[in-house]
Each structure stands twice: as structure tokens, then as C-alpha cells.
């Protein structure tokens, strides 16, 4: 009788664990190196309620997004898809530039104009809404320091505003982390010429991402 009780307890525990695993929401994050930086922290923060994945590699600009979005999302039946494009789109590059990534805002050519960025983003959202039933969340593009070699500081504001209009058109939620990213970058940025963050910076960004996602994971 004693062994039967033990077996029943173990069975209930196993059922409970399996149920918890099945109840976890599938979250897919799409983005560039900024999201690659904070995704491990988001994964840890949400480990009890969500299974978090990131698109393979760097999502780069909206052109890359258009080419790959269907392949990326077909890998799973996602509950939530969080996405961002922006920093690569507004970047100026020149083939002769010696700066990493051939960035050059003085002599280079912008990757995607504001108009083309908005158009590409509109097409991507249309694909997402057509191909998946996932809840969609757009995260705004983060801060660009003044001395960044290939990007103008004010362009981020313009591109974010354009993105918000597209999201409003499609009734997509927006997690606007731009203002927070400024404060975080000033303390934990990699420099006045670098859009990236230290480990502590990515952890701070992840807190704002996690907080928003928790309200949507039900």
C-alpha cells in the first residue's frame, strides 16, 4: 500500500511537470545584435512561463526580414512574436570605409530610406498577420550615440515614428524602449561611437522587454 501511494504521488508530480511544460508560451524574438544581446536575459526571466527563441543569426535590415520572415516563423507554432528592425536600415555604408561594416554617414549611402523602411515593414507585418496567429509586438529601435560612424542620432526618432504608424495601421502593439535605451546607454553603452551595450546594459534592456512581455503572456 505504501509503495502504491508513492507511485501515485510520483505520477501526479510527473503529470504536473508535463502540464507546466505544455502551458509555457512559445515566444519568438526577431531582431539584430541588440536583441541578440538581451534575449538570454529575457529567456532566463521568463523561463517558468515561456520558451524563448531568437531568429537564427542577425535579422539585419527589413530587406533581410522580407527575404527570411516566412522561413523563420514556420519553424514553430508561435504564441507571441516580438520583432524589430531599424538600426541596420538607417545605417549609411560605403565600400571604401575602413570602419567595421563599412559604415560611413558622410560619404555612404543609406541602406533603406525612411519611405522604403516603412514600406518593407508594412509588407513584413502583412506577412506575419497572414502566416501566423501569434500575438505580434514591435519593439522600437534603440539609441544611437552622436559619434556613431554610420548613423545619425535623429534618424532613430524618425524611423521609430514611421514604424509606430505602420503598427497603428495594423493594430500591432508597440513596446517603446527608446527613452529607456538612452539612459541605459549613457551608463552601460560601449562608447559614444557604438550602438551596443555592455552585459549589464543588455540586462537592463531585458528588464523593460520582460516587463512588457509578462503582461502579454497569459
Descriptions of predicted regions:
Residues 20-81, 203-204:
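Serine-esterase "nucleophile elbow" of acetyl-processing enzymes
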Residues 22-23, 64-218:
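Alpha-helical cap/lid subdomain in secreted, periplasmic
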